[in-house]
Every structure is written in C-alpha cells, then in structure tokens.
C-alpha cells in the first residue's frame, strides 16, 4: 500500500461540488471511479478543500492510498486517459504515509473573478461573475476587507447547513486587484466556512458600488449580523487556486498558481 498525492484541475460547471453525494455527480465520485479501474479496489480520496457545486479548482490537492503496481508518478497519465476532459491530473507523486492533503496544509487559496465590464464576455462567462451596475471601486473594497485579516469569528459569512462546531478561522491575506475590466479577489486562509468566500464577495461588491459603507461591512461580520448578509456571489466566479504545505510535494511544478493566464490578461 502506498500513498499518492494528486494535483487536480477541474471545471466545476457541471459538478455538484467535490464531495460525494447521493443522486448527484461530483468530482470525487468521478475520480474514485477512475481509481477503482486502475487499482481494482475501492479507493478513498481526501482533498485539501471541499469545493461547492459550480466552483472550480486550478490546483486542488488530493491524496489516496492504493495497493497497485502503478508507480506514483504515473497516476497522472493513467488517470487522464480515463477521466473526462473537465477533470485533469497535472501531476502525481508518492508521498509519506503521514502526509495528508487536508490536515498537512498550512493554508488554502481561493480566487474570485468579477467581470466589471458593461458587456458580457462569452469566453470567460463560465469562470467569472459578470456584474456591472456601475464601475466598482476596488480600492474601497480592499480597504474594507483588510480588517478581516487575522483570526476572527466569521459567523456572518457562513451559510446555513455547516457542520462545523465553530465559525472561527484565520485569514492570512486578502488582495484585490483590477486588470482592465476584471477584478480578482484573492483570499488565503487556514480554513474556510461553508459558502464563506461567496458571501464575502457579495458584501464587498455592495461596498464597491457604494451601496453600503466599509463601516457597515465591518459591523455586519464583527457583530455576527448574519441576517443582514443576504447576497451570495455566484459559484462560477470562484476557484480553488491551491493549498500550501511546509514542503512542496510536487516536484515538476514549483509555482502552484495554475489559474488560466488568458483571463489575467483581460480584454484587448
């Protein structure tokens, strides 16, 4: 038996999230099915982050224990021959039995993309939220978000249905940048609550549109005013960029930010 780490990309548009569910197609289900074909035994996969329905991943990290003669670094090629084109394995490698995709991660990185153009763009529609009621003030959004850095109770930014015992987590960094009509919101945290990023984005957009002030934004999450946090950004604009570990287990790829380059270039 050996433990194999997988670096996984997927377009979440037609999946009901990462985790297996009854009567729904998920990324984990499809991946486990492919692993069964290779190993001839049931394989349990563990991911660094459990993305919700419609959310993408450009550098999801997964591990599994397999009893098979296939070398660890060959699983990427073999799996890609079995998986649909919406799921790709960028790299695979054998790791120590003590290494865990979820529990060994120092933090996770999510990115949200807002298309703030007056006009929709068909070619990035599946990976961004077209929101234009006015030009967003990304500087105001960034300033409002800065107070969230650190360990706090983010109860206001947790959707109903979470099984967590508490809503405390630590945000390491938040960055908001505009590239022409596209706004990129990058959030790095030790862990994320259910629906957390999309609820944060929904509120920050209201700040950027001057519909609520930065002070109201802060008051809502600091004082746990969950009933005032009603707007959730669409899933399609959210992407799990990567998970960061004490040691980068993937040897071929040093830079784990695999976000689509064509989006970063914006419109010409």
Swiss-Prot record:
Q: Which InterPro entries match?
A: PsdUridine_synth_cat_dom_sf, PsdUridine_synth_TruA, PsdUridine_synth_TruA_a/b_dom, PsdUridine_synth_TruA_C, TruA/RsuA/RluB/E/F_N
> Does the record carry tRNA processing as a key word?
yes
Q: Which reaction does it catalyse?
A: uridine(38/39/40) in tRNA = pseudouridine(38/39/40) in tRNA
Supply one GO BP term.
Answer: tRNA pseudouridine synthesis
Which Pfam families does the record match to this protein? PseudoU_synth_1 (PF01416)
Residues bound to substrate are 110
Question: Which EC class is this protein assigned?
Answer: isomerase
Catalytic residues, chain numbering: 52
Keyword Repressor attached:
no
Organism superkingdom: Bacteria
- Enzyme Commission number(s): 5.4.99.12
GO MF annotation: an example: tRNA pseudouridine(38-40) synthase activity
List, alphabetically, the PANTHER family matched. PSEUDOURIDYLATE SYNTHASE, TRNA PSEUDOURIDINE SYNTHASE-LIKE 1
Which proteins does it associate with, and in what oligomeric form? Homodimer.
Protein's job? Formation of pseudouridine at positions 38, 39 and 40 in the anticodon stem and loop of transfer RNAs.
List the HAMAP family hit by this protein, alphabetically: TruA
Family listed: Belongs to the tRNA pseudouridine synthase TruA family.
Q: What is this protein called?
A: tRNA pseudouridine synthase A
State the gene name recorded for this protein: truA
